[in-house]
Amino acid sequence: MKAAVEKLDKNQVLLEVEVEAPRVQKAIDQAYRRLVKQVNIPGFRKGKAPRFILEQYIGKEPIYNEAAEIVIPPAYEEAVAEHQLEPIDRPEVEIVKVEDGEPLVFKARVEVKPEVQLGPYTGLEVERQEVEVTEADIDAYLKRLQERYAELEVIEDEPAAAGDIVTIDFKGTVDGQPYPGMEGNNYPLELGSGTFITGFEEQLVGARVNEERTVNVTFPSDYHEKDLAGKEAVFQVTVRGIKRKKLAPLDDEFAKDVSECETLADLRQDIRRRLEESQKQRVEAAVRQAVVEKAVAAATVELPEVMVERRIDARIRELERNLQAQKMTLEEFLKNTDKTIGDLEKEFRPGAERDVKTELVLEAIAKAENIQPSQEEIDAEIERMARIFRQDPDTVRKNLGDLSVLKYDIMIKKTIDFLVEHSKPVPPREQGAAGETAETAEATPA
């Protein structure tokens, strides 16, 4: 087989492939055997008509076309591999010549991954935050634990206060008319949690059991449901019950109740360790993101539109899945937000372009540095997945198929590892931006 490649504009290439005559003849014979079984020819049992009779009945062209469908796909793949091309779309194929006893010639026009002009990607200066956990962080964490494990006391003779959980019946109107979804009974609401629209919960502070209150609120101008954006609403609310959190004292018994620690001092030490580990992970994630962003910004590449469009489509499909989890269709979301699919595509384009460029640049760096996953790394990742899914490693390997996605993911991770290892850490301009507080940490110690 012979294959020549010509570079065209906009990441397009033209392959001209000539497949040797014996291989073509074998495909023609195979095509005849396929077609003769599909055609009813008077005087012959199905599949038994000689080729010249079949040709008289349907002509030579269908046989040649069938032969081309047999020959071209594998020949195209061989030509792509020979010239180390990376197609990103389906090829446009033109059959130039196919006949008995002759080579088959075809042309394939296809868009390939573009060449990336890499900028500097080693020695990049990246800010690295210091990991620091204060006593105040630990105190705040403990406060959250107290809140989480608090007992609820029924309040009968006192007014509701911020932090109390009130059980309410409510019915809302807009412009004097009931509105779907603005009604509920026996709804538990923590005052100050921000669960309801701004101003709603504040107006229930001071209410007593069985008290009725009129609550007036205004929906934000950017409210997700466009029909309510900027509108005033009136709610008739009845407080059916009040419960108040009773916090346990911070002592050794509390430590035993909420963790495996024996003393409060041990619990504080365990919390410090957890917060430090969580901060380290956040700092490392920030460093990895920063070094990738710098390497990508320094590179130049013409983004293939087909890759960008696919990434946009993927984002829309992800949105659709998230909406389904909320019992909402994409059509309902578009109606509520007064948007069109075109608006979403425009909104998602910058992120899609950023993702595509990042992918291309990381691949180019991996190629330049000859970064590939080792068999040990592949096996280790399969073992890790097997532990997570509680499956046998052989089962995981079988489910993964040819492992191409796994190998790619490992390659990208190793490439980012390389960038981090060859970066230059510098002190942050403002200390503490990556520091973690108890508000963002995991709430349950071991």
UniProtKB/Swiss-Prot annotation:
Domain of life: Bacteria
HAMAP family assigned to the protein according to its UniProt record, in alphabetical order: Trigger_factor_Tig
Name of protein: Trigger factor
Biased composition (Low complexity): 432-446
One GO MF term: ribosome binding
Notes on the domains: Consists of 3 domains; the N-terminus binds the ribosome, the middle domain has PPIase activity, while the C-terminus has intrinsic chaperone activity on its own.
GO BP terms in the entry: 'de novo' cotranslational protein folding; cell division; chaperone-mediated protein folding; protein transport; protein unfolding
Region span, Disordered: 423-446
Chief localization: cytoplasm
EC number in record: 5.2.1.8
Gene Ontology CC terms, in alphabetical order: cytoplasm
EC top class, as a word: isomerase
Location of the PPIase FKBP-type domain: 163-248
Recorded family membership: Belongs to the FKBP-type PPIase family. Tig subfamily.
Catalyzed chemical reaction(s): [protein]-peptidylproline (omega=180) = [protein]-peptidylproline (omega=0)
Role according to the record: Involved in protein export. Acts as a chaperone by maintaining the newly synthesized protein in an open conformation. Functions as a peptidyl-prolyl cis-trans isomerase.
Organism: Moorella thermoacetica (strain ATCC 39073 / JCM 9320)
Compartments where found: Cytoplasm
InterPro entries: PPIase_dom_sf, PPIase_FKBP_dom, Trig_fac, Trigger_fac_C, Trigger_fac_C_sf, Trigger_fac_ribosome-bd_bac, Trigger_fac_ribosome-bd_sf, Trigger_fact/SurA_dom_sf
Record keywords: Cell cycle, Cell division, Chaperone, Cytoplasm, Isomerase, Rotamase
